């Protein structure tokens, strides 16, 4: 049975970062990307993951080699940090998915697309608020938490959700007062009651992006659109802004 305690336990499990991440964070905060890469480059699973994200995200950098130090420095601190963060979250992923219709490699594909498109949107603003780039990897955390919570239920539940306007988020909200958006807020150290104007704006843009990505033909069958209640009705100006950003 689901309980508030079980929900919080799963959220804490997925968001908990190892001491290795703290070490890397120390280097990145000091602006030392090279040392951060050196700390990770002998970890085979990270090299494979990083390569997979880099190839799929198609970051616009003029380099075709495979030197991690060169790539990371060209990507910049914020983008490299987002990839590292997503890697440690990805390590918490179950190997087999029951709630969502994808394999673990599809999670990497989705992660790469959300990250690269979110970066394009952030790059389109005059003021570059790259601290919000972390929203992208935390979207993967939501998928993992949702899978962990609902995978133990009968498959017929997934069928009901698939053919109705009910979302996993709505179930948790009504039963336990929990929203998957709380994961983003907790991870980003945001307080729902005291969000700044820029916080609200960035969360709104990111919500629109998640709606867009989950409805893409290549991702729609995954079922991730059933995690959150996407209740944004953007102005035409906002839609045009996002469309132009994603075309770059």
Where do the model's predicted regions map?
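Conserved alpha-helical "signature site"
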Residues: 1-137, 144-154, 158-222
């Amino acid at each position: 049975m689901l309980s508030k305690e079980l929900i919080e336990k799963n959220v804490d499990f997925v968001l908990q970062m190892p001491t290795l991440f703290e070490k890397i964070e120390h280097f990145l905060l000091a602006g030392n990307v090279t040392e951060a890469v050196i700390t990770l480059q002998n970890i085979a699973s990270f090299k494979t993951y990083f390569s997979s994200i880099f190839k799929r995200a198609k970051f616009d950098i003029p380099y075709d080699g495979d030197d991690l130090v060169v790539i990371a420095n060209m990507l910049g601190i914020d983008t490299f940090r987002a990839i590292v963060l997503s890697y440690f979250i990805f390590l918490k992923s179950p190997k087999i998915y029951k709630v969502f219709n994808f394999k673990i490699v599809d999670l990497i594909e989705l992660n790469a697309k959300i990250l690269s498109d979110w970066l394009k949107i952030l790059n389109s603003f005059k003021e570059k608020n790259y601290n919000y780039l972390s929203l992208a990897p935390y979207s993967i955390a939501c998928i993992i938490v949702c899978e962990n919570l609902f995978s133990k239920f009968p498959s017929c539940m997934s069928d009901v959700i698939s053919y109705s306007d009910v979302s996993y988020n709505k179930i948790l909200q009504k039963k336990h007062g929990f929203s998957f958006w709380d994961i983003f807020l907790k991870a980003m150290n945001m307080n729902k009651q005291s969000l700044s104007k820029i916080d609200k704006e960035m969360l709104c843009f990111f919500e629109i992006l998640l709606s867009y990505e989950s409805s893409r033909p290549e991702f729609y069958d995954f079922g991730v659109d059933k995690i959150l209640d996407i209740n944004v009705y953007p102005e035409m100006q906002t839609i045009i802004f996002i469309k132009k950003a994603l075309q770059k």
